[in-house]
């Protein structure tokens, strides 16, 4: 069969008319330099701050520097395979991480990917890593307690749900131990926990996970890991990822607790990124926005009101408030709290628990310095019985420290001063507590009651620990109903006072320690 030119032309026109091409507009750029986890991109015009950029090899970058003719981005993951001239694509999306109950009991990296070998995670969707904190109208004042299980903290520096309480001190003073015990104490409280490890050794993190598992607290906890071996970009993003995972519970009318361990290493990672991006350095070579780095993170810890929760859940949850309580950790150098990052975080938070090397080395653990430790909003959240009984504890310790300083230079002390010194020493001894042994409200109340009512006066100083252990064992075995009642109601009235007095009197009459 022969085709003439007219038929061929018609056939071609028909094919052209039928040809359907899908046009795709892509925002594409070219890598012009790669160094230390930082890439510079030319030609990526339509890009926003914090946008995810698709890189060759199924990895992503995050746009941080938007300049006139280039974009500076950090690589989330390995960057050794990237080279100049490679094409990159803007995604138009902000970084998101998986959230939901499926993350509880799991160890994940900054991007929410499981690293514990327990298989994939069933999440309830994704949420942005960077979120604007709830406004003033959406918040509610702090009025419910978070029990850490430590007598010294719950009595003198109480923490409320939705509070930001800084744990600050030199290295090896028990900061992480305090935070881990606070998590262990939440296993039956209904408070979900998030532990964010930033720039720590992998062996240290593995030990923390093992301890949480041993004490039955891992099932209630999400562990987010950005270890020392990971890039500065992942260490920088880790706290925001953990915060997003904690906000999932807050926004649904539940309570959550998040530990940032620690924000000193977080600031160092951000300083490294900023200097590599050639941002101008300021004090201690930190960039100018290092305050905003931590304030935008810690402001997300809050107690939100019922209207906020109802609006967020579209009416599914009514009459419930939600909270996210933050315990950021800061490591100081030689006790210098006036350095740049410590002063920043002190001014952002609602109080600080200051741990000192001197107290730690003297065997007073937790090494809390009651003189400069403070909780600015937690007093309103303290349980009634602990609030009534702890009033004299801080005063006794403050007077003891003052008198002890003078007593060094004076040998002839009057009886009143000697009695006060003796009482202060015993209260100091009583505030000591072993790691991984958090105490219930009733146990704390009983011990504080004994100190407040003078039951320790005839107990020798070196026997205080034995007296406490024997008293608690007796109370738990013989007066379990009273202990359960205090744990449930935390009331302080004449009936409770009489029953506690009778308990201690009968114990002292029938027991030795």
UniProtKB/Swiss-Prot annotation:
Enzyme class: translocase
Name of the protein this chain belongs to: ATP synthase subunit alpha
Function: Produces ATP from ADP in the presence of a proton gradient across the membrane. The alpha chain is a regulatory subunit.
Family annotation (PROSITE patterns): ATPASE_ALPHA_BETA
Catalyzed reaction equations: ATP + H2O + 4 H(+)(in) = ADP + phosphate + 5 H(+)(out)
Molecular function terms from GO: ADP binding; ATP binding; proton-transporting ATP synthase activity, rotational mechanism
Location of the protein in the cell: Cell inner membrane
Keywords from the UniProt entry: ATP synthesis, ATP-binding, Cell inner membrane, Cell membrane, CF(1), Hydrogen ion transport, Ion transport, Membrane, Nucleotide-binding, Translocase, Transport
Family from the record: Belongs to the ATPase alpha/beta chains family.
Organism from which the protein derives: Tolumonas auensis (strain DSM 9187 / NBRC 110442 / TA 4)
EC number: 7.1.2.2
């Amino acid at each position: 069969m022969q085709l003439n030119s007219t038929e061929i032309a018609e056939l071609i026109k028909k094919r052209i008319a039928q040809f359907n091409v899908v046009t795709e507009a892509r925002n594409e750029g070219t890598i012009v330099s790669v160094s230390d986890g930082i890439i510079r991109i030319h030609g990526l015009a339509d890009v926003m701050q914090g946008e995810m950029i698709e890189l060759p090899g199924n990895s992503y970058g995050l746009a941080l520097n938007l300049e006139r003719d280039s974009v500076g981005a950090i690589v989330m993951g390995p960057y050794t395979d990237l080279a100049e001239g490679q094409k990159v694509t803007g995604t138009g999306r902000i970084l998101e991480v998986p959230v939901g109950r499926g993350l509880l009991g799991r160890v994940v990296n900054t991007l929410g990917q499981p690293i514990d070998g327990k298989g994939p995670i069933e999440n309830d969707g994704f949420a942005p890593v960077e979120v604007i904190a709830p406004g003033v109208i959406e918040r509610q004042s702090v009025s419910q307690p978070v029990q850490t299980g430590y007598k010294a903290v719950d009595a003198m520096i109480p923490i409320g749900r939705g509070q930001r309480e800084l744990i600050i001190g030199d290295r090896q003073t028990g900061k992480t131990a305090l935070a881990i015990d606070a998590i262990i104490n939440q296993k039956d409280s209904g408070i979900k926990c998030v532990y964010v490890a930033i720039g720590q050794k992998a062996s240290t993190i593995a030990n923390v996970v093992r301890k949480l598992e041993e004490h039955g607290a891992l099932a209630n906890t999400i562990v987010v890991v950005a270890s020392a071996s990971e890039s500065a970009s992942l260490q920088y993003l880790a706290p925001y990822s953990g915060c997003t995972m904690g906000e999932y519970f807050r926004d649904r009318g539940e309570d959550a607790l998040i530990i940032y361990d620690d924000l000193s290493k977080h600031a160092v990672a951000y300083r490294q990124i900023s200097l590599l991006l050639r941002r101008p350095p300021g004090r201690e070579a930190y960039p100018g926005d290092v305050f905003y780095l931590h304030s935008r993170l810690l402001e997300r810890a809050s107690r939100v009101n019922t209207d906020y929760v109802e609006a967020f859940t579209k009416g599914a949850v009514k009459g419930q408030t939600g909270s996210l309580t933050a315990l950021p950790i800061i490591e100081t150098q030689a006790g210098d709290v006036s350095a740049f990052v410590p002063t920043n975080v002190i001014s952002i938070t609602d109080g600080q628990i200051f741990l000192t090397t001197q107290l730690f080395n003297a065997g007073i653990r937790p090494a809390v310095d009651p003189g400069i430790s403070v909780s600015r909003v937690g007093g309103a959240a303290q349980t009634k019985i602990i609030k009534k009984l702890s009033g004299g504890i801080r005063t006794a310790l403050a007077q003891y420290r003052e008198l002890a300083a003078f007593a060094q230079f004076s040998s002839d002390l009057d009886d009143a001063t000697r009695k006060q010194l003796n009482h202060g020493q015993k209260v100091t001894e009583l505030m000591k507590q072993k790691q991984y042994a958090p105490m219930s409200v009733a146990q704390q109340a009983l011990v504080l009651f004994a100190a407040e009512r003078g039951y320790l006066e005839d107990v020798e100083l070196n026997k205080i620990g034995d007296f406490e252990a024997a008293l608690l064992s007796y109370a738990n075995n013989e007066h379990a109903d009273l202990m359960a009642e205090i744990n449930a109601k935390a009331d302080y009235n004449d009936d409770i006072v009489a029953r506690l007095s009778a308990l201690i009197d009968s114990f002292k009459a029938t027991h030795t320690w």
